[in-house]
Amino acid sequence: MLDESMKERMEAYRVLLLWQKEGSFIKESGLSPFAMELALGVCRRHLYLQYFIKSLVKKLPSLEVCMVLELGIFQMFFTEVPDHAAVATTVELIKAANLGEGSARLVNAVLHAARRSGQPQLPPQRVRRVSIENSVPEWLVRRWFDIYGGDRAEAMAKATLERGVEWIRVNLQKVSAPVVAQKLGLTGASILYDRYVQVPEEVKLKTLLESDSFAKGEFSLQNPAAYLVVKLLDLKPDLKVWDACAAPGGKSALMAEMDSSLDILASDVSENRVLKMHDVVDRLGLTNVRVECIDVLSKGLTQDDACSSEFDRILLDVPCSNMGVISRRPEAVYRLSPDSIKELMELQYSLLESASKKLTEGGILVYATCSPDPDETTKIINRFVKAHPEFKKRGPAVYPANDDARFDGFFAQALLKN
C-alpha cells in the first residue's frame, strides 16, 4: 500500500509517461500540487536530466526506467527533498511500477553515483551548453542565436526554466479587484489595469479555482498580456466583434467584461473547445457573447449564418509555436521542429487571409501570437500587407514581455482596412 507521497510520485510518473508516449499536456492531467511540481519540473529539465543520466550509464535504459531516474535526479538536485529520501522513494517507485528487481538495482546504483559525482560538466561549445543546461533543443537555441544574438538567446533559454507568473482577471461587471483579492487572501498583491491581480508564488492555483468566488464568475485566470492585445482593437460601444480563434475564450470574455454593449462572436474549429467556451461564458454570466464552432478556412465561411455579415473588429489569435510561453507550457519546446514552424507559418497566413475578408471597411483586425519569432509575426504581417494594399499597419506591433517580464511573450499587430 503506497503512502500519500508515493501515490503523488506515481501520479507524476504516469503522467510523464503519457507525455512521452502520446504527447499529452501535463497541466491538463489534474495532478495534485506536489505531483504537478514533479511532472512539470522533469518536463522543463528533460534534456538536461537525460544528459545527466547518460554521464552515469553506458547505455540508456528503457523509457520507463529513464522517467523514474529523471524523477529521482530532479528531486535530488532541484527540490528540497533530502538526497536519502529521493533515493529511497525512487527505488520504491520503480518497484511499485513493476519494472523488476534488476531495474530497481540499476536505479539505486545510478542515484548513489549521482549523489557522489554531483552534476556533470557541461560541454564548452556555447550553443550546445545553453541547449543542455536549459533543456531547449539545440536547433532551436541555434535559431535564437542567429535571430537575437548570443546574450539574448541565452536569456530566452534560461527564462524557459522559470515558472510563469500567475494572474487572475477580475470580472469588473460583478466585483472590484481589491474585493476579490481580499476574499482570496491576496491582499497587498500587485494589481494592474484595475482588473488583474498577481498571484503570489506560494498560493496554490487549485485553491483559487475551488473557491466560491471562482464558481460565481468573479474572476478567471489570465495573463495581463491579453489586455494589451485586446487594447489594440480600439473597442467602441455596440461594435460587432469576431474572436476567430477564440478558445479557451479568455480574450472574448475580457472584451465582454469591458463593454457589455459589444456584440461578440467567439468561435473555434474544435467542437470540444467550443463546449468549454460555453462553460466559461455561462460561469461568468456573459450575455453578449455567442459561441460557435467555425472553421475560419472553410470555403463556406461566407454562407455561414454566424459569419454572414462583416465585423467591425476581428481578433485573430492564431495557433503558433508557443515560443513565448514555454515556461508555462514546457511541453511546447519538444514538439517543435523546423518543419513544424514552416507548416505553422502557412496556416497562420491562410487564417489571416480568410478572416480578413470578413472585416468591414474602416475596421480593425488584430493579428496575435504567443510567439515572438519573426517567421510567425513580422514576416506574416509584411507579406500580408504587401499582398493586400487595402490593409495597413495601425501603429507599432506590441511585445508585452519586452516591457514587463511578468507578461507572457505575445506579439500583436493591429491592421486597418482602408
Across the structure, where does each feature detected by a protein language model lie?
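S-adenosylmethionine
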Residues: 1-418
